[in-house]
Amino acid sequence: MAGALGCSPLKSRPGSSARVAFVTANLVARVSDYRFEMAHWGDQHKKTVAATDAAAWGVICREIAATGFQAVEIWEAHAAPEVMNRERGATWKAILDEHGLKAIGYGGSLSRQTLEICQWLGIPQINGSIGDNTPGQAAAMCREMGVRFNVENHPQKNAGELLKVVDGGNDWLGVCIDTGWLGTQGASGPEVIRACGPLVRHVHIKDVKAAGAHETCMLAEGVAQVAACIATLKAIGYSGWYSWEDEPEDRNPFDSAVRNRHWLEKQLA
């Protein structure tokens, strides 16, 4: 492919923002009645893959659209390489279209298989782990497939550690800032954002109650400095998407989706 898949602006519904997306990983606990422990994420992933057929995907998309979101970032478990094919991809895309949702990102691990899924669904970027690939291998695959990759911070505590994963970044490799994980690591989100500068190509907006753990909470009610992070993103000229992320272990994230969307849209206004 000559260039990256497009990510054109959406026509906003009243009261919505075309730059705000719903991360479907928010529904990690859906298969266990919205109760789970973060340490068992892998088990939830497997159960979600098994539970997500076309009917289940349709219900998920309908519920997301009902909260006013127009865009989604699809968690790998909802469109997993082990079960997806071109035909299924076309079905998933048709369901998204039916509910007025645009897939703007894929949250998962970089591989030829996940890049292919992005092609089927019209997704321009993968945000997550570089997997077993070297930066050179990753850039070559992304260039060939026309889909970008952004490494998401989890253990990293500063920009140097993050940029090392993508060998400083390039046209195809960048950074996805996860404000919640920076809060968990006790890092300064604004400082990391400033240091990464134009290599920040995507953002997961999440808040956590305290450093040292990953207990998510309402935006602006935790320690992740989300308002300051957004202000810094504006200051460096970031114009990409803001994916709202909240993977609660003991509640249904749909209950707070509208509140958090409104808060985020107000910050971006």
Model-identified regions with their sequence ranges:
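Structured loop/turn residues at beta-strand edges in well-structured enzyme cores
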Residues: T67-Q70, L101, L121, D171, ...
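Hydrophobic faces of well-ordered beta-strands that scaffold small-molecule active sites
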Residues: A18-A25, V72-I74, A103-G107, I126-G128, ...
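Active-site beta-loop-alpha junctions enriched in small/polar residues
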Residues: A25-L27, W75-A79, G108-L110, G131, ...
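N-terminal pre-domain/capping segments
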Residues: M1-Q113, Q119-Q125, G160, R261-A269
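Extended hydrophobic secondary-structure segments
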Residues: F69-E82, G169-T184, P190
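Gly/Pro-rich active-site loop or hairpin
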Residues: E37, G42-D53, W181-S239, E247-D255
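Generic structural signal for well-ordered alpha-helices
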Residues: W57, C61-R62, G89-K93, S111-L115, ...
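Active-site acidic/histidine proton-transfer and metal-coordination neighborhood
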Residues: S12, I95-I177, L182-G186, F254-D255
